[in-house]
Amino acid sequence: MTSPLLISLASCLVAVNQASLIGRCDLAKVLHQEDLDGFEGYSLTDWLCLAFVESDFNITKVNENTDGSFDYGIFQINSHYWCNDYQSRTENNCQVDCQELLSPNLLAIINCAKKIVSGAGGMKNWVKWRLHCAGRPLSYWMTGCHLA
């Protein structure tokens, strides 16, 4: 579902010095627009906390792991299991090129994250979410954000 909000958000990100950071409330709006609030039992605050602890809201973050795989994008999705980086062995369960997970419109990474969360373990698949977000009060992540 491509929306005018996603298109305008992508335009803003590209226009500001090729910025790769997205604001917390802007991300909340996109996630809400893409129906992630309540998806598989996780709230927008879970998704915001995940994005912060994994990437500090950096859409284009890439991190190399000790096993030679890479983590991509705002949710740091791993190339060994979820996307094809053409560098390391991959299962490519999301059937997507890893570079697409760095796109400012966020659709590819949101769709892949939904697939991950829909499977066994849900958000527990992200170690940093388990350590820093799970079971904690997270309502402050939405402070000052207006979704309408």
Curated annotation (Swiss-Prot):
Disulfide bridges in this chain: 25-145, 49-133, 83-98, 94-112
Q: Pfam families given for it?
A: Lys (PF00062)
Q: Which reaction does it catalyse?
A: Hydrolysis of (1->4)-beta-linkages between N-acetylmuramic acid and N-acetyl-D-glucosamine residues in a peptidoglycan and between N-acetyl-D-glucosamine residues in chitodextrins
One GO-annotated biological process of the protein: fertilization
Gene Ontology CC: acrosomal vesicle; cell surface; extracellular region; sperm flagellum; sperm midpiece; sperm plasma membrane
Which top-rank group of organisms is this from? Eukaryota
Q: What is its EC number?
A: 3.2.1.17
Q: Which UniProt keywords apply?
A: Antimicrobial, Bacteriolytic enzyme, Cell projection, Cilium, Disulfide bond, Fertilization, Flagellum, Glycosidase, Hydrolase, Secreted, Signal
Q: Which GO terms describe its molecular function?
A: lysozyme activity
- The C-type lysozyme domain covers 20-148
Task: Tell me which stretches of the chain form a coiled coil.
Answer: none
- Record keywords: Disulfide bond included? yes
Compartments it resides in: Secreted; Cell surface; Cell projection, Cilium, Flagellum
Active-site residues, as the UniProt record annotates them: 54, 71
- In which broad location class does this protein mainly occur, judging by the first location in its UniProt entry? secreted
Among InterPro entries, the record links this protein to:
Glyco_hydro_22, Glyco_hydro_22_CS, Glyco_hydro_22_lys, Lysozyme-like_dom_sf
Asked if the record carries the keyword Repeat, the reply is no
Record family assignment: Belongs to the glycosyl hydrolase 22 family.
- What's the subunit arrangement here? Monomer.
Name of the protein in question: Lysozyme-like protein 6
Organism this protein belongs to? Bos taurus (Bovine)
